[in-house]
Amino acid sequence: MLLNACCKKNLWPRNGSTIFRRFALKLRPYQEECLSACLNAFDEGKRRIAVSLATGSGKTALFPHFIKYAPTLRPNSEQCLILVHRKELALQALKHCRESLPNKSIEIDMGNQCASGLADVTVASVFSLKNERLLKYNPLNFKLLIFDEVHHMASPSYLRILEHFGAESEKSKVNVIGLTATLFRADGKGLACGLDEIVYHRHFVDMIKDNWLVEPKVINIKWSTDLVLADSSSFLDQEKLKKEAQSEKAIFEIPRAWLEHASNRSSTLVFCINVEHSLKVCNAFRKLGIDARALFGETNDSERETLIQDFRKKKFPVLVNCMVLTEGTDIPNIDCLMIARPTSSPNLLTQMIGRGLRLHEGKRDCLILDFCDSLRRVSLHVDPTLAGLSPDEVENFYNKSKNSLANPDYDPKIYGLQSVLWYSKLRKLIEMMDNIKNKDRSIFNLSTNAWVAVGMGRYVLSFLQKVLIIDTNFEDGTHKISEYTKEKLGTRVYNRKRIVSDRIPSLKFAIRAAETYISNLKTPRSLISRKAVWRMRPASVRQINFLKKSNLKLDEKLLTAGVAADMITKVIYGGKGRQVRTDKLQSYLKHDANLKRITTLKELKG
């Protein structure tokens, strides 16, 4: 449940002048609203709450205030633990706490730096806290756990810490706050295992509108790399994509685009596919006389710190990185981003874009050179959610895994990202039918399993005595996964229904979540793969007879068992309920509220 940003009650005066003057930084209005929402939730008895705040909104600045005002649940339980997963996040949290809480003892527990477990405030690495290192923290002495970048919470490392502090359920014995800019996961895992309610949300588009973030200006760059490969789940396609992206032609297109569009920008951050790609792109910049440096995971700590500090001081104009500067690093002078790393994840794309949106003196906007058509391919209007599969349903999750947005006169260089996103949202309302058809065709790129698009936003996968169905919600574009299991009661066979997951933001995520669930059932690949041997064999007599009864025209000699199985699935799950779903869609598109939205669309286009 998402609370309104305007809280039901305030625990202090709106201006906060007397409350916050002891702190190093005064909170912005939305930060005050967020803090009020969290404390009100604790006051109402909620113990595990979530906050969704845009990248660059100053989440870390809230930590000292949470520590100061969070209620104690037991006598003498005043200690607080801040949990992060990256060194940069730990150092930021440490800096804010030391500046704003000078009278508190503050320690860090990460890598070779070991804390006593007795400090008033400890900033710790999630991955360092295990075995004896976790046991030194006495749960009875703690009032608050703060999880930064909490969208990682579904992993076992986080759940282990929650269990140690007695916070594994809504009857938690300690207050828990989880913060992130992206409160959803691309792998289908839910966050409800550690959090119970989203009490505050502020999207980065809202932050741009209110001038708390700079406006992005987007230019789509035509890249020679085949971006269709980026949407494929095939390992071979992903390898082919990496190879194409590292061709000499594709590599040099990146610095040439910078020279054409961004040579007047002071600080450009480039996102690349992997380390090899980063090094080649960096060398291409340097061959064209541009001072570029490369940063990736293997860069040692001292060199990394020097690179980032020099980049902050604008000593060189281009920093090329691979999966390092996506979370937590505060470099507000970045005024240009180059996205040369295809992604279908709203999480990752939001984090990448957020690197360039922070306010900075003399910075009017952030130019985004998008080589991957990211803003057309990935929806960033995704509401925060705790929904998804529980961790025990996803422990065996696999490790590997164009159409025009608007009218042809639309120019993202003029209108910027805010207009792109809003226009995309409206477009979905009046072209729901077309979008569903596009998704039906793209199902083959999203999975190698034999999903069948039966029409009107429904996708079906049959195996053993089970059927998984993904249905599209026409009102908000989310997806629901249902499982039907054939069971026998006496002589009667019936289907038992179970909702596996709901309100999944995209079809790709729904497919991933469903296949995560299937893998946990240890379903043989030979039953569900689109390339299974049995699907290539001739259709059985039983299949042919069923289809004949359905009055379908058949070429029995050419009909394979796989094609016949798909046709049967369409007959059973497509026809039944199709009219109901059609009526729902038509009703939604004709609703008065949406007519207003369509009117707004026409005005925007005009």
Curated annotation (Swiss-Prot):
- Enzyme superclass (EC): hydrolase
Q: Which residues are noted in the entry as ATP-binding? A: 53-60
The alphabetical list of record keywords is:
ATP-binding, Helicase, Hydrolase, Mitochondrion, Nucleotide-binding
The Helicase C-terminal domain extends over 246-398
Q: Does the keyword Transcription apply?
A: no
The record's annotation in InterPro entries points to: Helicase/UvrB_N (IPR006935), Helicase_ATP-bd (IPR014001), Helicase_C-like (IPR001650), Helicase_Restrict-Modif_Enz (IPR050742), P-loop_NTPase (IPR027417)
**E.C. numbers:** 3.6.4.-
**Domain Helicase ATP-binding residues, every copy:** 40-201
MF terms (GO), sorted A to Z: ATP binding; ATP hydrolysis activity; DNA binding; helicase activity
Name one process (GO BP) from the record.
mitochondrial DNA metabolic process
Chain positions of motif DEAH box: 148-151
Recorded GO cellular component terms are: cytoplasm; mitochondrial matrix
> Which cellular compartments is it found in?
Mitochondrion
The family database entries (PROSITE patterns) matched by this protein are listed as: HELICASE_ATP_BIND_1, HELICASE_CTER
Annotated family: Belongs to the helicase family. IRC3 subfamily.
Q: What is this protein called?
A: Putative mitochondrial ATP-dependent helicase irc3
Protein species of origin: Schizosaccharomyces pombe (strain 972 / ATCC 24843)
